Amino acid sequence: MKIGLILCALTAIATSGCRSNRQEAFDFAGFRRLEPHVIENDLLVGRPSRPMILDSLLIYTDKFEGRLITVLNLNTGSYRRVLSSGRGPGEMMMIRRISYDSKDKTIRLFDNNANRLTTFSATRSFSDLFSVSSIEDVIDFSYDNVPFEMAPFGDGYIANGNFDGRQFSLLDGDGRSTGYFGVYPGNNDDAGSGDAFFMKNQTLMAVKPDQSRFAAAGYSNDQLVFYKAEKSGVPQKTREYFTFDADVETMTHEYGVRVINKPETVSAYMCLYPTDKYLYASYKGRTIEEMMNPDIEKVNYILKFDWDGKFIEGYVVGNIDDFAVDETAGRLYAFVYEDGDNILTAYDL
């Protein structure tokens, strides 16, 4: 299996068509291109996602034969499939988020199907990681109070959604909301439409491992906002980037809200990954129409920021899905979907 990039036609017209003329917050033309290296062709079996680096381990979701998570030792190539699918003790249904807390050395898994947040010890051995005996805490939410997504932050948790027109909810250690904050960018006229407004302006979140900072970014708008925890309560915004609003439609039906993309809908941020020093963000910045054009190069941009929100540098990579960064090794690991197969790929930073 080879990894290839679909190159733009080498003409002035085709090259200019690789990006539209809309205003953007960063100079993507000046980003450094990274070359891919195939790590594993056969290990990824489903649609792997949510990767996280823990020392020499790559942890990610990839449902296979009733197991939800794969733990791969990057040094030896050995791996384990862990966590059975179900609602019993030590089982999960649908993992929305994998978070690491460096303060207490724990891994938290948020299951938005079972409405449950489970905390595991991260200090266990390779053979005992994610075992039932390694569970340290479980928080169950009622159906009416379960957030769309949540992650440990400060002394509790942070959740995103539409909370009376606010972007985020600050939760205590038991998962109870202590207040809402954050203003959605751009046009807020329909903020009162609840879930429909949130799905239009849906955000990704990433939290610094020591829980002192977090960032959020838009799927269909290019808001990227940084916050730091405050002992007084409401987190303080330290930096925000924003140049264009979401251009999508929403449809409400009996099962919830559906987002409908248009040809001019821009796919903005795709994945955020936090390390001790930096936030890494992958960004497409192309419309649906552009992504369907075979003459336009299929690449993603990786943006690197410090936790105050200062832009450090940028890279150009292939058409990757989710990714994780091993800062010690200076390497970015990504999932690439090509010709019906998922490939674990690495880029040296």
Whereabouts are the PLM-identified features?
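Beta-strand-rich domains and repeat architectures in extracellular enzymes and scaffolds
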Residues: 37-68, 270-288
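Blade-loop segments of beta-propeller domains
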Residues: 78-108, 112, 135-139, 317-322
